[in-house]
């Protein structure tokens, strides 16, 4: 093999090794930042209807209130690049199916890029006045780490994600059937209207 070709091959091999090393370091960093917590999973509820959350005004809400309904549960943020598209499509779905037993439960979260920095009242004003949301908005929560709210411990236990259970970004979505089973989990980049067919299928189920 000519010396120049051998040099090119060695250089390409070196780049590949560096890239693989970079991926490995990035993956380890991700696991370190958002580790799974066995003790937290053990403490999670056996039913979504046994869990209580707080609404945007700080009042306790038992999720048993939503028994028999199809739920789309979303961690939301007001200043994300995904915000406008998601709220627009969630509004479409809610208007279309709310009378058929469909609910969207939106949980503000500031853990991703600090894109939900406001107080609960500021969030409520933004969501209701700018994004025109009519579905329930709840108290700002954490979805990863030691302060993860019980609901998200339960959701992640029921439906793990790619490369670990941690929520990866704003607007991750969980779909819950009428019996309270977490039937699917969707990436933040999955638009609400892409989920419509799955929602319709669950609404048609007894």
From Swiss-Prot:
User: Pfam families in the record, alphabetically?
Assistant: GSHPx (PF00255)
Enumerate the Gene Ontology biological process terms: abscisic acid-activated signaling pathway; cellular response to water deprivation; response to hydrogen peroxide
Q: Would you tell me the protein name for this molecule?
A: Probable glutathione peroxidase 3, mitochondrial
In this protein, the active site sits at 80
Q: Give the activity regulation note.
A: The redox states are modulated by H(2)O(2).
Which positions are tagged coiled coil? none
EC number, UniProt record: 1.11.1.9
Q: Provide the reaction this enzyme catalyses.
A: 2 glutathione + H2O2 = glutathione disulfide + 2 H2O
Question: Keywords in UniProt for this one?
Answer: Abscisic acid signaling pathway, Mitochondrion, Oxidoreductase, Peroxidase, Stress response, Transit peptide
Q: Which InterPro entries match?
A: Glutathione_peroxidase, GPX_AS, GPX_CS, Thioredoxin-like_sf, Thioredoxin_domain
Tell me, in a sentence or two, what this protein's role is: May constitute a glutathione peroxidase-like protective system against oxidative stresses. Involved positively in abscisic acid (ABA) signaling pathway that regulates numerous ABA responses, such as stomatal closure, seed germination and inhibition of vegetative growth. Oxidizes and represses target proteins (e.g. the phosphatase activity of ABI1 and ABI2) when oxidized by H(2)O(2), probably after ABA signaling. Modulates the calcium channel activity in guard cells in response to ABA or H(2)O(2). Confers tolerance to drought stress, by enhancing the ABA-dependent stomatal closure.
- Tell me the organism: Arabidopsis thaliana (Mouse-ear cress)
Similarity comment: Belongs to the glutathione peroxidase family.
Give the record's subunit note. Interacts with ABI1 and ABI2.
Q: In which tissues is it expressed?
A: Ubiquitous.
């Amino acid at each position: 093999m000519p010396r120049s070709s051998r040099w090119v091959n060695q250089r390409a091999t070196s780049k590949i090794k560096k890239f693989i090393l970079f991926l490995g370091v990035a993956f380890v960093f991700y696991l370190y930042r958002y580790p799974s917590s066995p003790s937290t999973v053990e403490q999670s509820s056996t039913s979504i209807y046994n869990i209580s959350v707080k609404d945007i005004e700080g009042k306790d809400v038992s999720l048993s209130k939503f028994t028999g309904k199809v739920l789309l549960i979303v961690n939301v943020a007001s200043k994300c690049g995904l915000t406008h598209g998601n709220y627009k499509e969630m509004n479409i779905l809610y208007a279309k199916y709310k009378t058929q037993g469909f609910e969207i439960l939106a949980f503000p979260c500031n853990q991703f890029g600090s894109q939900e920095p406001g107080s609960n009242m500021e969030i409520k004003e933004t969501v209701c006045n700018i994004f025109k949301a009519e579905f329930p908005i709840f108290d700002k929560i954490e979805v990863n780490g030691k302060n993860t709210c019980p609901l998200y411990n339960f959701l992640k236990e029921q439906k793990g994600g790619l490369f670990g259970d941690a929520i990866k970004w704003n607007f991750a979505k969980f779909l819950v059937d009428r019996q309270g089973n977490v039937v699917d989990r969707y990436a933040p980049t999955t638009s609400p209207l892409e989920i419509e067919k799955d929602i319709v299928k669950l609404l048609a189920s007894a």
